[in-house]
């Protein structure tokens, strides 16, 4: 298994129990969507899977190793094999898009090469190619502060694709995009995962997108796994219970009409 959790609890420093009793296995090459209401623990779970947060109890295995039994150096080497796509990518405002994308390889480069890349981007064609897949090739030398929220999200995705990881974890990666663009972007991510055998786990508020693109759906509520089902087995009853007391989101928040057509699942 690429990712395995057994009896996992995670308690934040303020004492809040964010995850409790998680049992979960995800195989290499699986595409999994995590859905659930706000505050359910989706982002915390992704940070746990990225080895950015340690569990408070239980056993965590990532790519065949227990990350918190490794040295800091070994754990950093493990993280090179994992890409975490943030809902709001932490990109310096004055950084150029080409540099932001090439930062996907910083974990592999030494200090000297990394500093040189800040002055003279080392792989402009590579950055251009991955940006072109996301319809951003014309933004190659634009500063990040000039981009919209949806464009910044696509730059974060481009950086993850350029990194070429074995595991890709995406936290609300299309929340700032209109429905058509969100659908296209998720289709691209899923197709990349299929072609390269990448394990893809994404948290999504837009349930319709999750069901359209991911074969496996995990519902999380109150820090626990509420259900773990094939997409075809997820019923309205499952969703009503998962999102009790919260309005169900079927598409990203946008000014674009929600009736925009959806393309087939990847």
Which functions belong to the PLM regions below?
Residues 35-37:
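The feature captures the beta-strand-to-loop junction immediately N-terminal to the Walker
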Residues 113-138:
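Conserved ABC ATPase "signature" region
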Residues 58-66, 78:
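Conserved ABC transporter NBD signature motif
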Residues 168-171:
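Catalytic Walker B motif of ABC-type/P-loop ATPase nucleotide-binding domains
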Residues 143-147, 151:
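Conserved ABC ATPase signature
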Residues 50:
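Helix-to-loop junction immediately C-terminal to a conserved catalytic motif
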Residues 204-205:
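H-loop/switch region of ABC-family ATPase nucleotide-binding domains
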């Amino acid at each position: 298994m690429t990712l395995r959790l057994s009896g996992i609890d995670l308690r934040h420093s303020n004492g809040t129990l964010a995850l409790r009793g998680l049992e979960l296995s995800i195989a290499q090459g699986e595409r999994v969507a995590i859905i659930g209401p706000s505050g359910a623990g989706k982002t915390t779970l992704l940070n746990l899977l990225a080895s950015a947060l340690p569990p408070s109890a239980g056993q965590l295995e990532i790519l065949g190793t227990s990350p918190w039994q490794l040295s800091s150096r070994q754990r950093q080497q493990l993280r090179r094999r994992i890409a975490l796509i943030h809902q709001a990518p932490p990109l310096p405002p004055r950084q150029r898009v080409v540099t932001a994308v090439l930062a996907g390889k910083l974990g592999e480069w030494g200090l000297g090469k990394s500093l040189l890349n800040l002055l003279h981007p080392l792989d402009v064609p590579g950055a251009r190619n991955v940006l072109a897949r996301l319809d951003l090739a014309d933004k190659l030398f634009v500063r990040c502060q000039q981009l919209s929220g949806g464009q910044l999200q696509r730059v974060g995705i481009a950086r993850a694709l350029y990194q070429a990881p074995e595991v890709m974890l995406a936290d609300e990666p299309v929340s700032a995009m209109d429905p058509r663009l969100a659908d296209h972007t998720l289709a691209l991510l899923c197709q990349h995962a299929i072609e390269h055998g990448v394990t893809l786990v994404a948290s999504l508020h837009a349930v319709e997108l999750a069901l359209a693109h991911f074969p496996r759906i995990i519902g999380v509520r109150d820090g626990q796994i509420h259900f773990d089902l094939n997409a075809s087995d997820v019923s309205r009853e499952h969703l009503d219970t998962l999102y009790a007391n919260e309005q169900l989101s079927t598409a990203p928040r946008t000014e674009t009409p929600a009736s925009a057509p959806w393309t087939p699942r990847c």
